[in-house]
Curated annotation (Swiss-Prot):
GO-annotated biological processes: base-excision repair
Organism: Methanococcus maripaludis (strain DSM 14266 / JCM 13030 / NBRC 101832 / S2 / LL)
Phylogenetic classification of the source organism: Archaea, Methanobacteriati, Methanobacteriota, Methanomada group, Methanococci
Protein name: N-glycosylase/DNA lyase
Entry's transmembrane regions: none
GO MF term (any one): oxidized base lesion DNA N-glycosylase activity
Keywords for the protein's UniProt record, in alphabetical order: DNA damage, DNA excision, DNA repair, Hydrolase, Lyase
Length: 252
């Protein structure tokens, strides 16, 4: 059942946003972007940086902590440890097995790492630059190697984080494609219930088309502010007049 009044309010709010606002949210507000910037600056290997980001993305579910803290743990660890193509999978599995924030379903997650590592080992920085301009192709290949649907949470999330990592490495912004759907995690599912009990992916696809903002960028707008430790005061000066509309998202 749909709450049409709330949906109309949501669409009115998103009428004030665009892709550039989502980019601002990503680069100035999303702590996951910050920790990737810190990690990139502490590593001397951009190719390995992107590969590690993809590996971490495909096991970022059923966490024992928040997504923000999990990515902070990832960044801190790999700023002090090395990996290369010969030991990429083994090195990452060692990190995963000893992590604090990701202890559930380890056997399943390790199998995912084993499936995707051969694909990543054969890629170089030029390949990643090509994928950055064709993220739907990356989605297709990740889906194939992981034997997962293209709209599965970790596959689309991996593309999102790959986009972050590539933006940082190549210092260039490519918007996410309209055809790549929102990662359906617990925050998004819970928030969607304010508007409808239908499939969150279907609902946010409709919002995306109306607002003319790709679903992964919509995720960047709503996901951070739904976090339980989100500090609105710290971001007010970074978002000018759009701050009040962002605040309204939490009041619906």
């Amino acid at each position: 059942m749909r709450n049409l009044e709330k949906i109309n309010e949501l669409l009115e709010i998103f009428g004030h946003f665009d892709v550039n606002f989502a980019k601002t949210m990503e680069e100035k507000i999303d702590t996951q972007y910050f920790v990737l910037e810190n990690l990139k600056n502490s590593m001397n290997n951009d190719e390995m940086f992107i590969k590690l980001v993809i590996l971490n993305s495909i096991v970022s579910y059923q966490l024992c902590t928040t997504g923000e803290l999990w990515w902070e743990e990832f960044s801190k660890y790999w700023s002090k440890h090395d990996a290369n193509n010969e030991n990429l999978g083994e090195s990452y599995v060692n990190f995963l097995e000893n992590s604090k924030g990701n202890k559930r379903l380890l056997n399943v997650k390790i199998k995912r790492i084993e499936r995707i590592t051969p694909f990543l080992e054969n890629l170089n920085l030029l390949d990643f630059k090509t994928y950055y301009s064709d993220m739907e192709k990356l989605l297709e290949n990740l889906s194939k190697y992981l034997n997962s649907k293209k709209n599965s949470k970790t596959v689309v999330f991996a593309v999102k984080m790959f986009g972050y990592a590539s933006r940082i490495v190549f210092n260039e912004f490519f918007p996410y494609p309209m055809n790549i759907e929102i990662p359906k995690d617990s925050r998004i599912e819970k928030y969607t219930l304010k508007f409808t009990d239908e499939n969150p992916i279907k609902f946010w696809n409709e919002v995306s088309k109306t607002a003319k903002i790709p679903p992964l960028h919509i995720d960047s707008i709503i996901w951070p502010v739904l976090g339980r430790n989100f500090d609105f005061k710290s971001c007010e000066n970074k978002l000018d007049e759009n701050f009040r509309y962002l605040l309204k998202l939490t009041e619906l």
